[in-house]
């Protein structure tokens, strides 16, 4: 997905965000049907790639559409409502998947997406507004460079974390650096670059992007490490682990809409900064749990993490989108999705590295890394107060 986020976001600025979003829904729904009916592993793999392309089309313009659906004075409310939906999905998704697998075969995990996708397409066709378009041309070379750069970032990071041969890692890193430098150089003279360098010249946007990247790295570290931590270090069962993971997204779903509404009146830098302080504290409290904690000991710590992330997410999205001009909403939305995916990929790779160092103590080390990322995100968030003056 991460390889195509920025190209699809740029395409959205040219043809309209509504078209890209609906096309993403159609591709994702069709690919889900192919997954459910797949007759071989190669067929399933190809269908999963198509699913990723569809999801990329949805994610890259989702935040941009929110900007055009809600008036500026209610943008924080819109971001909060979006975060509510994401939080509920995170909380309910694993339970629904487990329920499906308890009564049906794995293809039904994909088949259930088909009626939901058709329903979503119908709503999108009816409700999504048309958006302004730019007259710029789609830059195919930049799209290829962006796909190679971000795709290689995820690949190289994963290979390095899993102890791949050094030659493979170094070769991937070399190509990544060359393509990345070429991409940046190609974007510099452009008025509406695919990699939104023009937006990074705005201090609030740059700091908001850094805050998002670090926060999602912290989230990625936590969400991948915690199941290992609960099962390997604390000796909890798989069922217990699933239940113990639930408080985080539930609290996010509860608090994110509140934080979004508050961000329409209170500086997002303040809300986001304190939210990341809460996440830092929650991750450290989890990392230093007693040897035999009760369920309540774990739940209230997970709730602190969810509360911190919930108070960060919506205000940061509002700050990031409002710091970009309306005609560059696609580029800003693309950076939102790219920061999320690259941050989560970075976190997952660091967990693999920590587990490679120690299966027993690796999860705790990963949580400490997550707290460090959240701390950096908090500092970057508060720095926006000075940058915005």
Language model feature labels by segment:
Residues 10-141:
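Helix-loop-helix hairpins in multi-pass membrane proteins, especially solute transporters
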Residues 92-101, 157, 227, 347-355:
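Small-residue (Gly/Pro/Ala) motifs that create kinks and tight helix-helix packing interfaces
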Residues 2-9, 94, 256-260, 348:
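Conserved kink/hinge residues within transmembrane alpha-helices of Major Facilitator Superfamily
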Residues 2, 29-30, 53, 114-121, ...:
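Small-residue-rich packing faces within the transmembrane alpha-helices of Major Facilitator Superfamily
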Residues 1, 28, 51-52, 59, ...:
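Structural signature of transmembrane alpha-helices in multi-pass secondary transporters
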Residues 102-211, 218, 236, 244, ...:
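Hydrophobic transmembrane-helix bundles of small-molecule transporters
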Residues 62, 85, 165-172, 191-389:
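12-transmembrane solute porter fold
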Residues 21, 28, 44, 138, ...:
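Hydrophobic alpha-helix/TM-entry signal in multi-pass membrane transporters
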């Amino acid at each position: 997905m991460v390889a195509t986020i920025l190209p699809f976001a740029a395409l959205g600025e040219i043809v309209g965000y509504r078209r890209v979003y609906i096309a993403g829904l159609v591709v994702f729904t069709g690919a889900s049907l192919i997954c459910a009916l797949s007759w071989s592993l190669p067929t399933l793999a190809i269908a999963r790639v198509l699913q990723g392309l569809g999801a990329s089309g949805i994610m890259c313009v989702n935040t941009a559409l929110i900007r055009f659906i809600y008036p500026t004075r209610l943008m924080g409310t819109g971001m909060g409502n979006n975060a509510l939906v994401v939080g509920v999905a995170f909380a309910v998704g694993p339970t629904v998947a487990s329920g499906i697998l308890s009564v049906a075969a794995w293809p039904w995990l994909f088949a259930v997406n088909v009626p939901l996708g058709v329903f979503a397409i119908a709503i999108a066709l009816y409700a999504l507004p048309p958006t302004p378009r730019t007259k710029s041309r789609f830059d195919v070379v930049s799209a290829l460079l962006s796909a190679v750069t971000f795709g290689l970032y995820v690949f190289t990071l994963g290979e390095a974390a899993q102890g791949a041969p050094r030659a493979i890692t170094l070769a991937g890193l070399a190509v990544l650096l060359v393509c990345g430098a070429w991409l940046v150089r190609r974007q510099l003279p452009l008025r509406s670059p695919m990699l939104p360098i023009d937006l990074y010249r705005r201090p609030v946007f740059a700091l908001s992007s850094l805050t998002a990247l670090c926060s999602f790295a912290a989230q990625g570290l936590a969400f991948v490490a915690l199941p290992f931590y609960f099962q390997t270090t604390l000796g909890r069962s798989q069922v217990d682990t699933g239940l113990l993971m639930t408080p985080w997204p539930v609290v996010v779903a509860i608090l994110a809409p509140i934080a979004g509404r508050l961000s329409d009146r209170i500086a997002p830098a303040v809300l986001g900064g304190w939210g990341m302080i809460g996440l830092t504290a929650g991750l450290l409290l989890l990392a230093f749990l007693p040897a035999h904690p009760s369920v309540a000991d774990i739940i209230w710590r997970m709730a602190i993490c969810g509360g911190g992330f919930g108070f960060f997410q919506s205000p940061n999205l509002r700050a990031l989108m409002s710091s970009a001009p309306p005609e560059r909403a696609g580029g800003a939305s693309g950076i939102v999705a790219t920061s999320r995916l690259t941050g989560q990929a970075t976190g997952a790779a660091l967990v693999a590295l920590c587990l490679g160092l120690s299966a027993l103590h690796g999860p705790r080390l990963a949580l400490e890394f997550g707290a460090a990322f959240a701390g950096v995100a908090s500092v970057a968030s508060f720095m926006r107060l000075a940058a915005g003056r």
